[in-house]
Amino acid sequence: MKKVEYWVKIPFGPIHPGLEEPEKFIITLDGERIVNVDVKLGYNLRGVQWIGMRRNYVQIMYLAERMCGICSFSHNHTYVRAVEEMAGIEVPERAEYIRVIVGELERIHSHLLNLGVVGHDIGYDTVLHLTWLARERVMDVLEAVSGNRVNYSMVTIGGVRRDIGEKQKRLILDMIKYYREVLPQIEDVFLHDSTIEARLRDVAVVPKKLAIEMGAVGPTARGSGIKEDSRWSEQLGVYPDLGIKPVTPEDVTGEKARGDVYDRMAVRIGELWMSLDLLEHALDQMPEGKIKTFPKDNILVAKLKLLGDGEGIGRYEAPRGELVHYVRGQKGRDGPVRWKPREPTFPNLFTIAKALEGNELADLVVAIASIDPCLSCTDRVAIVKEGKKVVLTEKDLLKLSIEKTKEINPNVKGDPTPTGIGCSRGV
């Protein structure tokens, strides 16, 4: 008899307990086996680029920070580097060291958060409690250094806004000592626990070839054995003086990279140790001197407005992978004519979608979590050029909203009005 296969398509998201943020995946299944994953972006779009092109260079710094709450420093830092390249602005050496310190503090908190999320997603909440308890220490230090647990506003064009004094240095050194005592326990649980290994080994394997073809970045790429880290390859700032190098699974486990969820977690654990080393070296080597080139923001904006046409690209290794910001300026404008961020989740999301083919449906959540997706800074609009142009007013949007609501629920009554009064539900 001829074998007949029945494939089923099910939606995963956009609202689902297994997702940190709204996003939609259409899963094609053959029984419990995943045949295809179709990624549907757009549920978190906030029009950040559109807003940015209507702001000046300084205002965009605060906008860039709010693209992502976990790696707010990374976005601002990368944007600022793009503007500095465009304008030819030199950054004081002390400011470069402070940037390293804040960046590595952010990396520690981001990796600990993701380790806890993965533990929770496989039902191992002991790991969640261990990692998130440890994460509180670095959050306290970030608050002491910047004044905030999130959105630190430390970086500015041409330097940093705040210095790191002796009190903050002592807090960071105490934190490093604390983590050198705590991390061995977290590492032991993650790398040598049979339950975790059974759930993470050989799940959502990203072969090295696939990672290269799909443009994977960060721990997702390094977990497949690719030695790539933009802090290292770009010789970024003072990182070369601090002994930066890419971390691969072989450095942590001693085994050749397989490219599975386990290896991606191993890379993050290895990078926690690397961040502690970088912090120690940065605090030890940081020179005295000024922390920014321009004392006032209005002086900075005036200088940028006088520049001729130009463009700049900023690259930085955010916790999730390589982050890129592109800026193009125009003479006489106090803001860019084009600002384009490229987030690490964008290539990683499509990489993991391909890697999920052939896996069990039960592994979907932990596989997605293993790339540590940030969907709020990834979403964008696709502009389809059909030769038509339509401008929708607030009234038009209200009318479309009510029409859609009536399609979903015919019992809803109401009409669009200039005052924006919505619908009323019939009794």
From Swiss-Prot:
Protein EC: 1.12.7.2
Subcellular location, record wording: Cell membrane
Keywords: Cell membrane, Membrane, Metal-binding, Nickel, Oxidoreductase
Thermal properties: Optimum temperature is 90 degrees Celsius for membrane-bound enzyme but 80 degrees Celsius for the purified enzyme. Membrane-bound enzyme has a half-life of 2h at 100 degrees Celsius whereas the half-life of the purified enzyme is 30 minutes at 100 degrees Celsius.
Activity versus pH, per record: Optimum pH is 7.0. Active between pH 6.0-8.5.
Regulation: Inhibited by 0.1 mM Cu(2+).
InterPro entries assigned: ComplexI_49kDa-like, NADH_Q_OxRdtase_suD, Ni-dep_hyd_lsu, NiFe-Hase_large
One BP term from GO: proton motive force-driven ATP synthesis
Cofactor needs: Ni(2+)
Superkingdom assignment: Archaea
Major location (coarse): membrane
GO molecular function: ferredoxin hydrogenase activity; NAD binding; nickel cation binding; oxidoreductase activity, acting on NAD(P)H; quinone binding
Annotated binding of Ni(2+), by residue: 68, 71, 374, 377
Cofactor annotation comment: Binds 1 nickel ion per mole of protein.
Task performed by this protein: Alpha subunit of a hydrogen-evolving hydrogenase that utilizes protons both as a substrate for hydrogen production and proton translocation. Acts by coupling the redox reaction via ferredoxin and iron-sulfur (Fe-S) clusters to proton translocation across the membrane thereby conserving the redox energy in a proton gradient.
Family in the record: Belongs to the complex I 49 kDa subunit family.
Known partners and oligomeric status: The membrane-bound hydrogenase complex is composed of MbhK and MbhL, and may also contain MbhJ.
Listed name of the protein: Membrane-bound hydrogenase subunit alpha
Gene name as annotated: mbhL
